[in-house]
Amino acid sequence: MKLRIFSSSRQIREYYNQKKQQNALLDSAIHIGEFLDKVCLSNFHKASSYESLLLMQEACLKSKDLEKKLGISVEFFAFLKNNEYLFSFFKELSLEKKSIEDLKNNDYYATYNEHLEILDEVYKNYLALLEKNSFYDDLSLPKNYTLNKDFLDEYEAIVYDLQGFLSKFEENLLSEISQIKEVVLSFKTSKFNLEYLLKLDFLKIFDLKINTHYEINLSKQEILKEEIFKTKNSKMKLKSFELRALQCAFVMDEISHFVRKGLKPENIAVITPDESFCEFLRLFDKDNMLNFASGISIKESLFYQKFQALYESASSASFIYKNQEDYFEDTQM
């Protein structure tokens, strides 16, 4: 049995929907995040989001100039709101196998050397605190891990359906796994990603062509599939409206048009400029046709609106509180 790795849950659902009609044993399919958790082992315990947050705050407290020079407050509630900037920056460095020293050597960041030195201190403090407390997380794992060979031995091959781009860590990991297990990389080329793909170490030897679907065995360095596909000559309709209400009406009309043309409703996607536009769409979606991927904020729920109205009424100066201990007895009568 093969293990198939996908970049999104939607791809996994599509894979099972396509294969469920076949009377055969299906390959296992998992998300890339789950695969990384299973295939990379550490001698430490994985830090929870709360533990990581507290350790990052402690690392920041050890850096005296962080708040003064970078304006990042280490006061807990302010830090709770802004810590994501630090985590995302350090995670990007970790996944791309880069150090802050590499950035300092780049002319583009020359004017920010003092800021980078402060961030470097915070980063080193954080990694040291993780190790001191026997923790690891997404920032430290790429620097120190071992392959879970028992997990890999459960499958005859690993097939990764690449959608998008690989981080340097993922690229190195696939190369490492390909030395002990058959690894197949499946991807499609286009004018947007061909140059990037040709720079990957394990694809440099291949003469990749544009608009082609490839399946390449990284272990044997051979092409298993090379299939040219035709790009769709898509026609775009561009409209502009001054009012959001008119934009919503246009969206609903286009959805109806697509359905009448025979397009399956589940294959229609509405991409919004921001989440606020979804609020307008909900008002126009009287028949509940739309499934909002972002979910519904609790502030928009009927329960919250009623509770908010009660709270505002109770907070009003004209609110009169009457203690009626026998209320339930009166209602039963």
Give residue ranges: language-model regions.
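Conserved short internal alpha-helix adjacent to the catalytic or cofactor-binding core
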Residues: 1-78, 194-333
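Conserved helicase NTPase motor core
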Residues: 107-204, 240
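Basic/charged alpha-beta structural segments of nucleotide/phosphate-handling enzymes
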Residues: 9-153
